[in-house]
Every structure is written in structure tokens, then in C-alpha cells.
């Protein structure tokens, strides 16, 4: 486990930075008085229940077909962290929005909890499109997707094989496959990767024999002098009143922490392969100019087909775009979806 912990310091992914920094309009738990919220549940193709919060404008005309957007949360988070904020802000602009909990997280089904399964995560986006397509007030030809952090890569993966997703946007995207294989800025060596995989397979056998589940560190539970700048960034969101949230029935100290034994599934996850086949459906990649994750949006943009846009937010880091309403380019997202879901 020591080898694994050392490697996690190199990987530093976004499932997860002493008081919460509430600057630049940080408002994760925003509540709009202009929209209605309804909890909904629907099946994915694996017959697992996916739970989401459905937001509709209070002044929406339900006798006509309206555009809709599926929104996915950061990896290791739940819909109450970042996704609900984006969903409400976009619903205020006239969209039907659906913020989902990915399978194995939050209120969605999946045992054991916190298991990594990018294939199922991606199917959750398609299942959300299934659900929205059956609502009488939603136009099934005008459904877009928005993935935040790790969900950006799941949304891209889903869109490659689901042409019903007419417009695809990502914010502070992580390529969850690349960051596990290579670390940030390709800082992980092949030998370190092999040691990482070995730790996971050894733990898998422990669990098969009835042993306790082990989790990868995710966001640290407390800071010390050795805590990295990236982890401090996540700590300020996930471990403070700014964005901390513990789903019912879970332990606070385990939030953001995926199962160690399942990390091999990210090693085999290549969401940007064939990304160009999404064209001619439009793609928008939003990242901050200070974001440690910027490399992933730049890579996706380079490999995607037209039409595409890389939108860089000045002065914004990775986690800033989770909840800092003075930095999040809601106007850009609104114009992108209005133009491409009309």
C-alpha cells in the first residue's frame, strides 16, 4: 500500500483543496427561485437505477418541446457538488436540465459503492437521454450533454456512440484514463504504472477472499506541510463548507475515494480515441488558464473534428470552475447550447 500511496501523489486526479475560500462568487449550494426541482430515477442499460435532479424553468411552456441538457458531476463527487449549480443556472436560461449521480455514487444504484466503471458511467449519460426523450415537454432532437471534470471524459465517451447527444460541452475536463496511466503532465513511468496495477490486483484478491474494501486516497482529509498544491485546491472544495457533501448512509471520510481494486478499468479507458467521429456535432471545451488539468481539454480539442472550440477562462484554476460563479462562463455555455439545440 505504501507504493500505491506514493504513486497517488504523482497521479493527483480530481476525484479528488483552513477555512473555505468563498471568493469569486463560490456558490456550490445555490438555490434558484426561478426553477423547479424534482428527483427522478430511471434505468441504465445494465438495469441499475440512476438517480438525478430534474430542473425545469417555472415559466416553461410544457405544451411544446423544449431543449434539454444532461449534466455529470466531477469524478468522486455527487450531483450536489457542482452539477446542481450548473443545472439550475442553465435551467434559468430556458433549458430542461438533469443532474445525475453516476452509478456507484450518491443516490444511484451500484454495489459496492465507489466502484470505478467508465463503461457504466458513460451509459448513465445515454440512460439520461433515454429518460429525457420520453418526457412530453422535451424535444428528443434537442438534447445536449455537459460533463464536469472526470464526467467530461465520460460524456465524450458516450457521445462517440450516441448520436442523440446533439451538442457536447466539458468544463475542467479530466481524461480519467490518461491521468491514471500517465499522471499529470506524463509524470508516471511505465514501472510506476505497473506497480500501481499490481497494488490494485492484489487488493482485488483480498476482497475476493472476503477482506475489507480499500480505497484510494482521493481528497485528503486534513492538510499538513507535505500536502501538494493540487490537493489543497481539492481540499478547499471537498473538505470545507464550500463544497463538502456526504450522501445519506456514507462516511464523510470516504467521500471522493474510489475503490482501489477497480482502478484497472481506468487504465483501459481511452475516451479521446475516435473523438473526431463525433463531428459534425459541435464540441465546446472549457478550462481555466491556471488549471492543472488544462492539458486534457487541449488534447481533446486538438483531436476533435469540427466544429469545436477551446474556451479558456482567465484567472481560473481547475476547481474554480466547479462553483465560482464569477468565473464560470455561464453566458458562453448558454449561447453554445442555444445555438446548437435550436
What residues fall within each predicted segment?
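Conserved alpha/beta-hydrolase
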Residues: 89-109
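Short beta-strand/loop motif that positions the catalytic acidic residue
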Residues: 278-279, 284-287
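N-terminal cap/lid segment of alpha/beta-hydrolase-fold proteins
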Residues: 21-64, 322
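Catalytic active-site module of serine/aspartate enzymes centered on a nucleophile-bearing elbow/loop
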Residues: 316-319, 323-342
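The serine-hydrolase catalytic nucleophile loop
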Residues: 76-88, 102
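Alpha/beta-hydrolase-fold enzymes
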Residues: 156-240
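Catalytic nucleophile-loop/oxyanion-hole region of alpha/beta-hydrolase
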Residues: 79, 105-141, 323, 327-329
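Catalytic histidine neighborhood in serine/cysteine hydrolases
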Residues: 304-319
Amino acid at each position: 500500500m505504501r507504493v500505491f500511496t506514493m504513486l497517488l501523489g504523482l497521479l493527483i486526479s480530481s476525484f479528488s483543496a483552513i477555512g473555505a475560500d468563498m471568493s469569486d462568487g463560490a456558490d456550490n449550494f445555490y438555490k434558484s427561485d426561478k426553477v423547479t426541482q424534482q428527483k427522478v430515477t430511471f434505468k441504465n442499460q445494465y438495469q441499475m437505477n440512476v438517480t438525478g435532479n430534474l430542473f425545469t424553468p417555472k415559466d416553461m411552456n410544457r405544451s411544446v418541446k423544449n431543449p434539454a441538457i444532461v449534466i455529470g458531476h466531477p469524478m468522486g463527487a455527487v450531483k450536489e457538488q457542482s452539477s446542481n449549480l450548473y443545472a439550475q443556472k442553465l435551467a434559468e436560461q430556458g433549458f430542461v436540465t438533469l443532474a445525475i449521480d453516476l452509478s456507484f455514487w450518491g443516490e444511484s444504484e451500484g454495489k459496492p459503492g465507489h466502484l470505478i466503471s467508465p463503461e457504466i458511467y458513460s451509459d448513465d449519460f445515454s440512460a439520461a437521454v433515454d429518460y429525457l426523450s420520453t418526457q412530453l415537454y422535451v424535444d428528443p432532437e434537442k438534447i445536449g450533454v455537459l460533463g464536469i471534470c472526470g464526467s467530461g471524459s465520460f460524456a465524450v465517451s458516450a457521445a462517440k456512440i450516441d448520436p442523440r447527444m446533439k451538442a457536447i460541452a466539458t468544463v475542467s475536463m479530466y481524461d480519467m484514463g490518461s491521468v491514471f496511466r500517465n499522471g499529470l503532465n506524463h509524470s508516471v513511468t511505465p514501472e510506476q504504472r505497473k506497480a500501481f496495477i499490481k497494488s490494485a490486483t492484489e487488493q482485488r484478491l483480498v476482497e475476493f477472499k472476503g477482506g475489507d474494501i480499500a480505497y484510494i486516497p482521493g481528497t485528503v482529509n486534513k492538510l499538513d506541510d507535505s500536502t501538494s498544491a493540487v490537493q489543497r485546491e481539492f481540499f478547499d472544495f471537498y473538505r470545507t463548507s464550500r463544497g463538502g457533501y456526504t450522501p445519506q448512509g456514507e462516511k464523510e471520510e470516504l467521500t471522493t475515494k474510489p475503490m482501489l481494486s477497480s482502478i484497472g478499468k481506468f487504465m483501459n479507458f481511452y475516451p479521446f480515441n475516435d473523438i473526431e467521429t463525433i463531428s459534425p456535432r459541435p464540441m465546446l471545451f472549457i478550462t481555466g488558464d491556471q488549471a492543472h488539468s488544462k492539458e486534457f481539454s487541449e488534447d481533446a480539442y486538438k483531436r476533435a473534428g469540427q466544429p469545436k472550440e477551446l474556451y479558456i477562462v482567465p484567472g481560473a484554476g481547475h476547481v474554480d470552475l466547479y462553483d465560482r460563479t464569477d468565473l464560470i462562463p455561464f453566458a458562453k455555455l448558454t449561447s453554445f447550447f442555444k445555438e446548437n439545440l435550436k
